[in-house]
Amino acid sequence: MSHLQNLLLDTLLGTKHVDGAALIKLQEKTLCVTSPGFSVMPCDVRTLLNGFAKNPLLTRREGLYFREKDYKCVRADDCSLYAKKENTGVVVVKTHMYLLVATYTAGMYPSVCVEATEKLGEYLRKKGN
């Protein structure tokens, strides 16, 4: 298991409020690592990258289609995308080298998912990643 996968497992899934997580390489526009059982298709990678490429207002207005679900975007800026659908959601944090993706499901606290994902994103930024 890689250092990056261990980071995902320990800091995100370890909270018990993140269902799945992934790191996407910005430069290559490819999936780098995921948590076990969490799949991100190439079309989902493009969707997330486009969410940051657009004007944040447009992303908030249009929402986000991720893993075959339409999500309402509740936050979109240069560093973060938050989207939800009923009692599930996706949190995406941009660093220098990666998009960090985390999802939550029913029974999980979205605020814990957001906090853990943002903290890991900040850690990666400080490390130059």
Curated annotation (Swiss-Prot):
GO terms for biological process: acrosome assembly; flagellated sperm motility; manchette assembly; sperm flagellum assembly; spermatogenesis. GO terms for cellular component: cell cortex. This is Profilin-4. It comes from the Eukaryota. The lineage of its organism: Eukaryota, Metazoa, Chordata, Craniata, Vertebrata. It is found in: Cytoplasm. Belongs to the profilin family. One of its GO terms (molecular function) is actin monomer binding. InterPro entries: PFN (IPR048278), PFN_euk (IPR005455), PFN_sf (IPR036140). Keywords: Cytoplasm, Developmental protein, Differentiation, Lipid-binding, Spermatogenesis. Involved in male fertility. Required for manchette development and acrosome biogenesis during spermiogenesis. Binds in vitro to phospholipids, including phosphatidylinositol 3-phosphate (PtdIns(3)P), phosphatidylinositol 4,5-bisphosphate (PtdIns(4,5)P2), phosphatidylinositol 4-phosphate (PtdIns(4)P) and phosphatidic acid (PA). Contrary to other profilin family members, does not bind to actin in vitro. Expressed in testis, in seminiferous tubules (at protein level). Expressed in spermatocytes and spermatids, but not in spermatogonium. The keyword Cytoplasm applies. The keyword Disulfide bond does not apply. PANTHER family: PROFILIN, PROFILIN-4. It holds the Pfam family Profilin.
